Structures are given as structure tokens and as C-alpha cells.
Curated annotation (Swiss-Prot):
Its EC number is 2.7.7.13. Mg(2+) binds at D110, D218. GDP-alpha-D-mannose binds at D110, D218. This is Mannose-1-phosphate guanylyltransferase catalytic subunit beta. Residues 2-222 are annotated as: Substrate-binding domain. Changing L303F: Reduces interaction with GMPPB but not with GMPPA. Changing D334N: In MDDGA14; causes protein aggregation; reduces interaction with GMPPB but not with GMPPA. Changing R357H: In MDDGC14; no change in protein abundance; shows an increased propensity to form punctate aggregates; reduces interaction with GMPPA but not with GMPPB. Belongs to the transferase hexapeptide repeat family. Changing G340R: In MDDGC14; slight reduction in protein abundance; shows an increased propensity to form punctate aggregates. Enzyme activity is reduced by incorporation into the GMPPA-GMPPB mannose-1-phosphate guanylyltransferase complex. Allosterically inhibited, when part of the GMPPA-GMPPB complex, by GDP-alpha-D-mannose binding to GMPPA.
Length: 360
């Protein structure tokens, strides 16, 4: 079985992290976002993953070729010369996707969840039509485009954009299974699968919705990235608690790479991820943060709701909060306060940032 993952965007919502690394390779809970998806696909029996790429494609190709042998699957690149939306990439990869009559997965690369791929295959084969989409329930459907479907069969009747009166609380979760016949519906041009292809399929009775059980998050922007981390760590607590850290100073769900080092009298957690080579010095407090590879947090600093990029250096007695994001290789000098700062890569911060802003 095959899968196409849409990884061609510029990752603008996740800047400054994506200024130096393509978004699919940004580490989420100590593993690239893309690798969470590819490993789950391989475990579900997918043997060929196609990446619809454009921005920084050479970096992606190098990394995924290294993973190809480890996972024992084929990974191909489909290069977009111009942005093709969410349906155009399927037309571009038509020859690869239609090599067999088997249905194939299509994934949005921003999504993190429990990835129920085997259940999706069973659901798709059971109803026997052209398309299946995964849907998830939300508390405020008026903020989203919602899916209106039959409760018992899942057959989709229509899509409603940001409804002001309640019609459904289910939204598109960004994961699909499609039969090769769908490729005949798509031209090689910029096209939205959600707005131009799916509504027609729904009218023809060819599209069904399967409801996702468990957590789901689009982690394409920093505040949602942190929320997604919290949900992922809670899922680990329930399913693989042995992967989480415990011991003196560890509070709640905390994921620590074996090569990371934590000093004395620290308070780490709840909801913290520390990547490979991270050093946390004595007396540091970290809550609801992710700290990426080879970063160092010096003594007595306090971090809450932050993303600390690769190889950053945070000084002593620093306070950072309110979705502060440090790009790669940022230095924060001692005794500073950063409130909602977004700092571009390779910057040195010498004064406090009391109000949210971008540091260029």
C-alpha cells in the first residue's frame, strides 16, 4: 500500500524554527514530525511513501533516504515546481499512486494523533466507495469547516464552512484513504481537495467519514505545537508509560532523551520534552516546554510555555514564558525576561522583551 504526505509548504506558521529546518523535520517530542507519521504508516503495512516536496527538498530527501533502509520501505520524492494546493500534488504523483489498484493514504504533514491507519483501511474497504476521511470532534465548530455525515454509516452529505448555527461538531482531521479512481477527478493545477474535490464526491455518495478516537492536533503553529506535545505525552502515559522520565524533580509527564543531562534541585514538568544533548543546569524550572537538541539552560532560569531551538544558550536567572520561541543557535544573556518573544536564528539577546514581538 502507498501513502502521499503533503510536505511542500514553507512552514511560515512555525517560524522561526522553520527558517533553518523544513517543518516536517522539526523535532516533536524528540522525533521529526514527519517520522511520527512515516513510522506509523510502515507499522500499518505501507511499503511506499511519496513525499510531495518543494521547500528545502534536498534536506528532506537526505534525511528520509537515511530512514528508508531502517524502516524497510520505499520513500520517493515528488517535486512541485509551483505550489499545487492540496489536490494538485496527487495529480503530479499520479503515475506512482496508480501503479496498483490498491487505495492509498493522503496525509497533511502538520497532524499528530494516534494514527489509526489499520482501522481506516478496514473502514474504507467496508463501505467500498472512492474516499474515506478521518474526522475529529471539536468543542467550537463555528471556528472550522465541519463535516455533516450520517451517524450510522459515516456517509458524508456536505461540508459547511464556519457554521453559525450547529450542524455538526466534526472536522476534517487531514488524513484520507482514496481509491485510484479519485485521480481522474484532479487536474495538474493548483487545486484544493477539501473545497473542490471532496464536495463533489460527497454529492455523488462517494465519500465517507470515520471518527477518530483519542487525541488530535494540528501542530503547525507554536501554541498548537505545545498543546499537541501535552496531548502526546498524556497518550504516552496511558500507552507507553515506560518511555516517560521519573525521579527527583520530575513532575507529571516528561520525556527526556537518554543523552540529556539535568542538574541538581531542578523542577522539570509537567509537560516537558528535552531532546538529545540538552543540558539543564542546577536550580532550573521548566514547565510546558520543548527544548531541542544540544540546547543549554543555565542555572536558576525559569521557562514556561516555550520552544527552545537547536543549540540555543539560555543564560542564568532568565525568565521566559507565553509561547516564547527561540530559533536555532540563539543566545539569551543572563537575567533577562522574554514574554512571547519570537527570536530568529543566530541572534544574541542582550535586553528583556517585556511584550510579545519578533526579534529579527
Amino acid at each position: 500500500m502507498k501513502a502521499l504526505i503533503l510536505v511542500g509548504g514553507y512552514g511560515t506558521r512555525l517560524r522561526p524554527l522553520t527558517l533553518s529546518t523544513p517543518k516536517p523535520l522539526v523535532d516533536f517530542c524528540n522525533k521529526p514530525i514527519l517520522l511520527h507519521q512515516v513510522e506509523a504508516l510502515a507499522a500499518a503495512g505501507v511499503d511506499h511513501v511519496i513525499l510531495a516536496v518543494s521547500y528545502m527538498s534536498q534536506v528532506l530527501e537526505k534525511e528520509m533516504k537515511a530512514q528508508e533502509q531502517r524502516l524497510g520501505i520505499r520513500i520517493s520524492m515528488s517535486h512541485e515546481e509551483e505550489p499545487l494546493g492540496t489536490a494538485g500534488p496527487l495529480a503530479l504523483a499520479r503515475d506512482l499512486l496508480s501503479e496498483t489498484a490498491d487505495p492509498f493514504f493522503v496525509l497533511n504533514s502538520d497532524v499528530i494523533c494516534d494514527f489509526p491507519f489499520q482501522a481506516m483501511v478496514q473502514f474504507h474497504r467496508h463501505h467500498g466507495q472512492e474516499g474515506s476521511i478521518l474526522v475529529t470532534k471539536v468543542e467550537e465548530p463555528s471556528k472550522y469547516g465541519v463535516v455533516v455525515c450520517e451517524a450510522d454509516t459515516g456517509r458524508i452529505h456536505r461540508f459547511v464552512e464556519k457554521p453559525q448555527v450547529f450542524v455538526s461538531n466534526k472536522i476534517n482531521a487531514g488524513m484520507y484513504i482514496l481509491s485510484p479512481a479519485v485521480l481522474q477527478r484532479i487536474q495538474l493545477q493548483p487545486t484544493s481537495i477539501e473545497k473542490e474535490v471532496f464536495p463533489i464526491m460527497a454529492k455523488e455518495g462517494q465519500l465517507y467519514a470515520m471518527e477518530l478516537q483519542g487525541f488530535w492536533m494540528d501542530i503547525g503553529q507554536p501554541k498548537d505545537f505545545l498543546t499537541g506535545m501535552c496531548l502526546f505525552l498524556q497518550s504516552l502515559r496511558q500507552k507507553q508509560p515506560e518511555r516517560l522520565c521519573s525521579g527527583p524533580g520530575i513532575v507529571g509527564n516528561v520525556l527526556v532523551d537518554p543523552s540529556a543531562r539535568i542538574g541538581q534541585n531542578c523542577s522539570i514538568g509537567p509537560n516537558v520534552s528535552l531532546g538529545p544533548g540538552v543540558v539543564v543546569e542546577d536550580g532550573v524550572c521548566i514547565r510546558r516546554c520543548t527544548v531541542l537538541r544540544d540546547a543549554r539552560i543555565r542555572s536558576h532560569s525559569w521557562l514556561e510555555s516555550c520552544i527552545v531551538g537547536w543549540r540555543c544558550r539560555v543564560g542564568q536567572w532568565v525568565r521566559m514564558e507565553n509561547v516564547t520561541v527561540l530559533g536555532e543557535d540563539v543566545i539569551v544573556n543572563d537575567e533577562l525576561y522574554l514574554n512571547g518573544a519570537s527570536v530568529l536564528p543566530h541572534k544574541s539577546i542582550g535586553e528583556s522583551v517585556p511584550e510579545p514581538r519578533i526579534i529579527m
